[in-house]
Amino acid sequence: MSTASLEELLSAAPGGAAMERIVAWMVAALAEAPAATLAVHLPRALAVLAGWEDRHREGWLEGFDAPTPHPLAPLLRRVSFDDGDPDYVLPFFASPNITHLTELDFFLSGEGDESKRRVLDGLCGSPHLGRLTSLSLVGAGLTDDDLARL
């Protein structure tokens, strides 16, 4: 299945490369592993994926922002962004791969007003966020119109 065991991957230092290996292991596991193996190891890998934050993003969200299906899209439930770089988040909001998100956290206070506006417009215009139960937009400077759109 993989050259490294899941135990080795989970004990690796956090970072994008480690997450890429975990995601690759999960994709292979979904395709190849017997159900007993998945029952033991996949929940731990999913917990790592569910709690991973954007500051470790060096590639782990790659593919989730595509218009084509990502094999792990149904498993992605929570995403936290440390910044609101429109070039990074707007394709993410437009992708159907985020339809399973239940929690979305943003920290936007370091961005300029124009960047915030673009991010908020993309968020408000996304047709894929209907399952959100928690939305945090710290520092977004929401207006009454923004709240009405959300």
Model-derived regions: residue spans:
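Terminal targeting and flexible regions in eukaryotic proteins, enriched
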Residues: 1-64
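Concave beta-strand-loop units of leucine-rich repeat
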Residues: 31-32, 47-68, 75-149
